[in-house]
Amino acid sequence: IKQIIQLANTYKTPITFRAAGTSLSGQSSCDGVLVVIKFAFKKIKINKDANEITLGCGVVGIHANESLAFLKKKIGPDPATINSALIGGIINNNSSGMCCGTKDNSYKTLRSIRVILANGSMLDTSDALSVARFKDENKKLINELREIKEEINANKELKDLIIKKFKIKNTTGYSLNAFVDYDDEIDILAHLLIGSEGTLGFVSEVKLAVLDDLEFKACALLFFDNINNAANTIKEFAKVDFVSSAEIMDYASLKAASTYDELRDILADIKEGNTCVLIQSEHSNELKLDENINKIKEISKLAYKSYFSKNKAEYDLWWKIRKALLPIAASLRKAGSTVITEDVCFNIEDLADGIKSIQELFYKYGFGDNGIIFGHALAGNIHFIITPDLNNKLEFDNFSNLVKEMSNIVASYGGSIKAEHGTGRMVAPFVEVEWGKQAYL
């Protein structure tokens, strides 16, 4: 990699690092040299206290969890693509997922990082000698990081904006919260690299804190008459600490999922506007889990129909359907069309209005027959899928206008145009729309 970077500098050729390419936001497309890292950097090492794991950037996410399974541990980030996504992509996009939220993502669980910068400098933040050498060789960079931090600290409006923006999931632009959360320049740089999509350096290795994988789990499948009832219930779930995940699926998602034989009976009576929420709760003690289930039942009184299960085979099926919504939508699209998946985040109190705004855009721009909405509602994070024919000028223009209007709507709510999929080429033109000129510059 160091040689590739040296050659790229010599010949003034841009390079892009590609992990598994599961993000679909355009991070791994380029017109220069594409460096594919999935065949190398496979290091997995658990420390003796079993509270940290060192991972090479080429490790598949699920393999990290499989190596921790005998300890009943797991890594924090839990993207739906964890069976394919590589650690390099998970780290560089600050990918989160269904349970980790903002509390246990890559940024929050990072303990050390190993990186090569564009100038060839190498830094391993777990090695004091490497840190000292890096500081000595990169005084200008260290000073610039310090100056940016001082500039942010001196600007209350900007600092408050950064703090507010990162209370919810946000991968639009760089991790500016690093300048607020950390004082040491090396810590700032390490956390700036999270979510930087390879634009600041090549991250070859990370050390992450590991979490307990709680033994006892239960899930609930809750059906609501409309988005409002679902969103109001999710607001209540967000106030408690015993719900680890709440996945929302709109009517179009349920209609698509009804093609699965195993769910045909459960979904037989759904009507236009109905919404489903898949809940997960977990605990180290089964009796405590049972108590949590009863509390969930109390909170879920707005649901017109509900299913509860501690049977792994049963709730795994529910999760399988949730995770399969993207391939289901892909299989139902018309010939020649493209699967587009977007990823936004609203503050939890704006969730219902935000979802309705997206649905209105579907119909305004001609995607009402193929647009579906689902996502990690406990974090206010929703995904939507549309399938435009980008070779059709009208559909291309409609898609372009939808994305532009969506970006302005999400920004008007104080939300994130990209919550966990990374900025990529898709959202790069809209970073300033969300952040404003002051933060963007």
Regions found by a protein language model. Name each.
Residues 328, 332-335, 429-441:
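Activity-critical C-terminal alpha-helical subdomain
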Residues 1-15, 37-79, 95-147, 212-225, ...:
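N-terminal glycine-rich flavin-associated loop
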Residues 1-41, 55, 75-76, 365, ...:
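Glycine-rich N-terminal segment of FAD-binding domains in flavoprotein oxidoreductases
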Residues 24-25, 68-117, 161, 165-189, ...:
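A gly/ser-rich beta-alpha-beta helix-loop segment of oxidoreductase catalytic cores
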Residues 178-186, 190-401, 407-409, 413-416, ...:
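C-terminal substrate-recognition/cap domain of FAD-linked oxidoreductases
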Residues 129-186:
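Phosphate/pyrophosphate- and phosphate-bearing ligand-binding catalytic cores of soluble enzymes
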Residues 413-418, 424, 433-441:
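Contiguous mid-protein beta-loop-alpha structural module that forms a pocket-lining wall or clamp
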